[in-house]
Curated annotation (Swiss-Prot):
The keyword Hydrolase applies. NCBIfam families: Obg_CgtA, Obg_CgtA_exten, PRK12296.1, PRK12297.1, PRK12299.1. SUPFAM superfamilies: Obg GTP-binding protein C-terminal domain (SSF102741), Obg GTP-binding protein N-terminal domain (SSF82051), P-loop containing nucleoside triphosphate hydrolases (SSF52540). Keywords: Cytoplasm, GTP-binding, Hydrolase, Magnesium, Metal-binding, Nucleotide-binding. This is GTPase Obg. The lineage of its organism: Bacteria, Bacillati, Actinomycetota, Actinomycetes, Bifidobacteriales. GO terms for molecular function: GTP binding; GTPase activity; magnesium ion binding.
């Protein structure tokens, strides 16, 4: 089995964000110290990186499922959770990332192109990690001073992608099976491709680095083509994707073939027809030269056979009439290889300069609109507010007469994933956010009535509930005692001296009030003393005397008063 794999389907998932913490600060002499729950850590992302040391996608065939590390949950004392580590996956230079399309459980086919990793070190974030949930310390504000909940971490992005390897080479060797392409790449470079005397020996592309003086260039040996390959004959056009990145196409023609109906000119025309069929299906990268416009070079091989050399000399003028450069070589005797090497080096130098010029012109012609730098807190403000374009509400109905309202939008779907539905206060916070965004108003506009089913989100992550716009905003104890609005600690509203620190003005006022009260008591006692109430017991025992200390209609403890 070959260890070369140039197309795989990979399932990637970013790490989940950690949950926020709903901690309460506990400190001596501070019974109402407030919330101190930290935020959850963000999940790690899955990143493809072009690596010059990688040459195949074989690892992803046997391990197609890759997942990044999740973030940890927040802790008390406003300690944020740690961020999950990013998962960096090395891929060969020239790898193209496509979105995988197709029904679940069946083979996928490439969809939209997501990235083209053409240079070593290029990176693409294929699955972003989820954001960590906010702790209750971050949720506290002027009106919600003691949140009893925190937000959950968001799940990481999850998707299927297709990786296609398109070899980066300067020269592509194309030709019929057994034309000598593998022998040529082995003779000009240090590559060791499989060589045998039967067709379709080469089943995978081979790359070789050729040295011409101080210059180096790469040649690619593409598996053999036959007429009708565009309709699936032979190996089809499966491996022709490897010539998309090559700037020079070299036709290797077998001049010693004995197959009936074949000659060098007919072989060239047949291959050009297949290339034209394939070129019409391509979407070339920025600055690339279309395949029909790329320079061709004709290599007449196997001239070590006498009849083949005569045929090569005969057809050479015919190719030159078409404006093509022709080289007569033999991979067995190495005849003409040195001249071919220098000719390819000069052609590669010119094409590299041409491609660089095209890319620069394309970049200058592109209009890049850069958004203004947003303030630091813009994201949080946008997360709370919104406009009518942030979501959509549609009325849905199935064949059974079941009716529901579907709410879709980035913010509502994110908020649903962040909500802990086991916490009534968190559910109420979600209701407040949706109402502030305008979801309730839009539901009324669409004709929704209390009790109608509402679904927020798509697929398995959708949340269903019965809409009740009149739900109470405050939480309740088990006995029905109202606790107040969400996030409001009623203890903070009490005038308890232990919960409030007096100002200096209040201390002075209370001190003067206390001293005035004591002075009034002393003056009253002094007046009673001067009136003789303390010296005459009969006056003190008079229950009709309103000015005495023991009067006011009270009966003596030792005996009844005589009438």
């Amino acid at each position: 089995m070959s260890d070369f794999v140039d197309r795989v389907t990979v399932h990637v998932k970013g790490g989940d964000g950690g949950n926020g913490s709903a901690g309460i600060r506990r400190e001596k002499y501070k019974p109402l110290a407030g919330p101190n729950g930290g935020n959850g850590g963000d999940g790690g992302s899955v990143i493809f990186m072009a690596d010059s040391n990688a040459n195949s996608l074989l690892d992803y065939r046997f391990m197609p499922h890759r997942e990044a590390e999740s973030g940890t949950m927040g802790l008390g004392d406003t300690k944020d959770g740690s961020k999950g580590a990013d998962l960096i996956l090395p891929v060969p230079v020239g790898t193209v990332v496509f979105e995988a399309k197709g029904p679940q459980g069946k083979p996928k086919h490439p969809g939209e192109q997501l990235a083209d990793l053409r240079h070593a070190g290029d990176k693409f974030v294929v699955a972003a990690g989820g954001n960590g949930g906010l702790g209750n310390a971050a949720l506290a504000n002027r009106t919600r001073r003691a949140p009893g909940f925190a937000l959950l971490g968001e799940p990481g992005e999850e998707r299927d992608v297709i990786l296609e390897l398109k070899s980066i080479a300067d020269v592509a060797l194309v030709g019929f099976p057994s034309a000598g392409k593998s022998s040529l790449i082995a003779a000009m470079s240090s590559a060791k491709p499989k060589i045998a005397d039967y067709p379709f020996t080469t089943l995978v592309p081979n790359l070789g680095v050729v040295v011409a003086g101080d210059m180096r260039y790469t040649i690619a040996d593409v598996p053999g083509l036959i007429p009708g390959a565009s309709q699936g004959k032979g190996l089809g056009l499966e491996f022709l994707r490897h010539i998309e990145r090559t700037e020079i196409i070299a036709h290797v023609i077998d001049c010693a073939t004995l197959e009936p109906g074949r000659d060098p000119m007919s072989d060239y025309q047949a291959l050009e027809h297949e290339l034209a069929e394939y070129a019409g299906k391509l979407e070339l990268p920025l600055g690339a030269i279309p395949i029909p416009e790329r320079p061709r070079i004709i290599i007449l091989n196997k001239v070590d056979v006498p009849e083949a050399k005569e045929l090569a000399e005969f057809v050479k003028p015919e190719f030159e009439k078409l404006g093509l450069k022709v080289h007569i070589i033999s991979t067995a005797s190495h005849e003409g290889l040195k001249e071919l090497n220098w000719a390819l080096a000069d052609l590669v130098t010119n094409m590299r300069a041409e491609v660089a010029k095209r890319e620069q012109a394309e970049e200058e012609a592109r209009v890049v609109i850069k958004p203004l730098e947003e303030p630091r807190n813009r994201r949080r403000r946008n997360d709370e507010g919104g406009n009518a374009l942030d979501f959509t509400v549609e009325r849905k109905e199935n064949g059974n007469g079941e009716v529901w309202y579907e709410v879709l939008g980035t913010k509502p779907e994110r908020w649903v994933m962040q909500t802990n539905f086991d916490n009534d206060e968190a559910v109420g916070y979600l209701a407040d956010r949706l109402a502030k965004l305008g979801v309730e108003d839009e539901l009324r506009h669409k004709g929704a009535k209390p009790g109608d089913e509402v679904r927020i989100g798509r697929g398995d992550r959708a949340v269903e509930f019965d809409w009740d716009p009149t739900i109470a905003a405050g939480a309740e104890m088990l006995d029905g005692t109202q606790l107040g609005a969400r996030g409001v600690d009623l203890r903070l509203q009490e005038s308890d001296g232990r919960a409030q620190r007096r100002s200096n003005t209040e201390r002075r006022r209370q001190y003067h009030e206390m001293m005035d009260a004591r002075q009034a008591v002393r003056e009253a006692m002094m007046a009673e003393r001067k009136a003789g109430h303390w010296a005459d017991p009969s006056v003190d025992d008079d229950r009709h005397d309103e000015t005495s200390l023991f009067g006011r209609g009270e009966t003596a403890d030792d005996e009844d008063v005589e009438q």
